[in-house]
């Protein structure tokens, strides 16, 4: 099983490799990837250094080209494919059908993965991507249960990648319109959920307020940790009560499901967080490396260590974790 870790910078990439990542995924410094924030991601020169470092240590580098090409501007996405291949990436993670077609026809030897943004949630969809574009792996959305993941593993021979830890999204990735509704821009087109140019913070007599395109998303009291203002994780007044009406900030943590993921034949476990710091990458990579190694050394004796959970909780969104949709009773 591959441990796939995020990097939004060269220091984060080196940290991931040094702490046991089998592969690292990154993006270019533009809107062709779904973590397009100021100060994040890689220029070609930085990416060249990243490739060298990863390959010197016997690991792999995946490049996310996982937004959808704008009308009349698809050349930029095709060029991203060209650059990724030329710079020596081991795999390209792509969502857009036309970009997949371009990559598969121009670079048939390149390993292609279907991005979570493509929202492939059934065996027929996965077979389509395999037959049309010869994809080797599909990244599954975080809304599937373990029962559904197992079902897909039985019905396809395409490698499956699942999110194992990190920020949790309650939407089927690739299908969310909340950011578009609020700002006119979506992660699928500009590469950012709640684009930074629409974010504003303001100290008021009532507390620290976070706004997205002038709409109040949350208000924080003294000493309360403030989160990045995403619409789905805001607190809103409903019937006279103020609470997280859509989703409470929390992180996915599937350490307890590791035996099931192994037995299901999941090819790769993915850590979310290209927008997070090298310190986050270090902590999470180290814990997950230890857990995977412990299971492989003695599957029968595998147990989640309390210190693993404690270390992950410290870097979790909202300082709490959940199994998310993986453990839901309804299918």
Where is each model-derived feature located?
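Active-site pocket-lining/capping segments in soluble small-molecule metabolic enzymes
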Residues: 1-120, 139, 143, 147-268, ...
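Conserved nucleotide-cofactor-binding alpha/beta core module
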Residues: 122-124
